[in-house]
Amino acid sequence: FIQQITGVLEYERCYLNTQHQKDLVINQAKKTFNDDTITKLNDILVPQHLGVDEKDIVDEINETPEKIIVFNHRPDTYKHFKEFVAVCDELYEMRQDFKVWVPLLPNPTRKYMVTTKGNKEWYYKELQKCYVGFSPKQSYGGWSVSTTDGMMNGVPYIMYDDTYYHELNEMGDFFEDDYTALQLLNTYLDDPEYRNEEASKALDWMRNKLVYKDKMLEMLFYMDRLVIETRAVKDTDRFKEIVEWIKTAGKLSKKDIIERLGWGRGIKWTPYRRALMNHPNIFDVNGSTPYYYYKY
């Protein structure tokens, strides 16, 4: 961990999927690094939400869905699946007017469960039939693609009350414990009008906040600004030496050049790369190992 953070401190920016993941890194780093370093790390680490493809967002919600509660996450311990089943068991003792769809479970373990499966197109169509989704507590706080899959298909989700779900839809309904989760499920099942209002709000949130293209444009604008602000090195003796090495060898990788220069982590490569890209006789080829070539 310490070695990885030392490397990250050389970055201009490092992206994570959620604020929760950033908080985990910062809290762990505080055990080793001083306050100034933590402040620098905090500026470098930036949550970058994954988003969804705009064309996958449905035009409108299904206002007459079947009474199906969907748990489209992995049915594993780190997703608190047993706790979810315990809530559903209690709900089933109170009422039997619902089903629970767990598409990633091999076979049903309760009479109220269904585990039907299909391809991606079929999966999206089945989600559109669902009444409400359930997003459980997570051990690692990653981005929940399962939740966005449902919301972009018009399904409202009740979510565990933590930052990694507030980022998905801060206007949604959240539960802190099993009792609250049970009450929310009853509310949705009893009140179709309320369910449809929450489904519409979730769909609007997806359109306005979580479109992948918009998130990538944010990243692109930042990178463009960073490149503009990063000046290329001038025509120094050291730069001329690098050009001569590439000319003599025909091609050299960044690693080859840095090893010849004897540089450590503290020297930034980007200004030299910009200068090489501005040179009329040098071009780069990206691959598993990027190379700089000299052309005559």
What are these regions (language model features)?
Residues 5-44, 52-54:
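A short, active-site helix/loop in glycosyltransferases that binds the activated sugar's phosphate group
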Residues 60-79, 85-89:
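Conserved donor-binding/catalytic core segment of Leloir-type glycosyltransferases
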Residues 152, 156-159:
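Short hydrophobic beta-strand element within catalytic cores of glycosyltransferases
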Residues 192-224, 228-231:
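A charged, aromatic-enriched C-terminal amphipathic alpha-helix characteristic of glycosyltransferases
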Residues 43-66:
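Acidic anion/phosphate-binding donor-loop and adjacent secondary structure
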Residues 125-142, 155:
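Acidic donor-binding loop of glycosyltransferase active sites
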Residues 124, 145-152, 165-166:
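Short alpha-helical segment that forms part of, or immediately flanks, the ligand-binding pocket
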